[in-house]
Amino acid sequence: MTRLFGAYVIVDYSAAEGKKTGESSVWIGVMKRDVRFRLSYEAHNPATRAEAQALLKTLLADLHKRGDRIFLGLGFPLGFPRGTAAALKLSGAAPWRQMLDFVSKEVKDKPTNENNRFQVGAKMNRLMTGEAFPFWGAPARDAQTMLSVKRAREHGPGDLPEFRLSEEAIKGPSSIWKLYYQGSVGGQALTGMPIVSRIRTAHGERARIWPFETGWKPLAPADLDGVDALFAEVYPSLFAPKASAGQVKDEVQVRAVCERFNALDEKGQLGALFGPAKDDPRRDAVESEEGWILGVSP
């Protein structure tokens, strides 16, 4: 049975400020075949997002030279809730592309891990609603008129959704509008999306971002003809067992996801995770703006 991928790279991400390793930092797991075609695994724990970006570029280039088609699983959102691009009055490309370009242009992340995500969140609030909403969460020193320390109010009728459709399906991840505190998905998205844009550009046109450029549907090997790397959003906690005493949770999770996807691919079952076989009323929102978390059942 033909596999979809020859190698798996899984990233558990962090929006931490300052150099950080260990718990709640960036972990990158890599599963590939060695020269004797035996399965091998390695883990990396770069101290900054800049180091992670450089490492990912190197890893993808090396795997590409080997002739492996690469699955790159990223532990942060690649899209925003439906309607976000329109609320920002962006136009031209597809909404997901508009948002990727907007965030990549606005967010500045220094080699020291210092970044301007709170300023960007405040700017987006001003452009979308003119109030400290929907983005929320910041240290007191970074709070401002358009970004509050705590959530300003609940989402109501007429507001942008608090959660994307895939998040509603599992009710696990925090909202992308949360920029600070534990599980700050918004901080991870704002600092992670520019890296996705740069890595994709470095890897060339033979890279694709799922489901925006592949469709939200089951994938077969023929669907990936001409594709060297597929980028997708993953939620490492979805598959991973609890860490034992002395283990780093994030490290355990990236390995578990690598092993899970490899096992499914070996059985010819991984392709079914990439979307529903039948038509779905959510398809347009998923494919055009929100994306989907791989492994979450439609």
For the regions a language model picked out, list residue spans one by one.
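RNase H-like (RuvC/DEDD) metal-dependent nuclease/polynucleotide-processing core
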Residues: 2-7, 13-71, 76-298
